[in-house]
Amino acid sequence: MKRHYFIILTTILVLIMGCATPRINIFSVTPDPLKEYTLEGTGADKILLIPIYGLISDNPKKGLITATPSLVEQVVSQINKAQKDKQIKAVLFKINSPGGTITASDLLYHEISAYKEKTGSKIVISMMDLATSGAYYMSLPADIIMAHPTTITGSVGVISLQPKVKGLMDK
């Protein structure tokens, strides 16, 4: 009889533990720290490379297991870290993006402008395959904008209006 109760109690505990497991986040949600690479030279001054790939959005990217910060959050985090490093003399944004939401593109535009004003660092934009709409707009504070000969760029149609002129046409 005691064995019967033991089996029932063990089964209940296993089921309860299976339903109330602690949430363990295996993958980090926070962005990685900035990594430094010495490509050439021995000087102390640095150039920061920030890639802008994909849709510019302020929504976190959700995967099957974890979510990663949005592109805007990642870039703002890198810019904030760069403001603390006085050895960064220039920031190179490598862009391959079709643009994105108006607000997200405008946030990056203002973050880049504020960084440039606070630090005096040079801002360089390198446009790769695609830099249209919001990606083009966020590039405007740059000191230098370079586009590959095959880059598709422009198309800043960030606000689209469709006026209704039916009443006007009837007159």
Question: Residue spans of the language-model regions?
Answer:
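Positively charged n-region of N-terminal signal peptides that target proteins for export
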Residues: M1-Y5
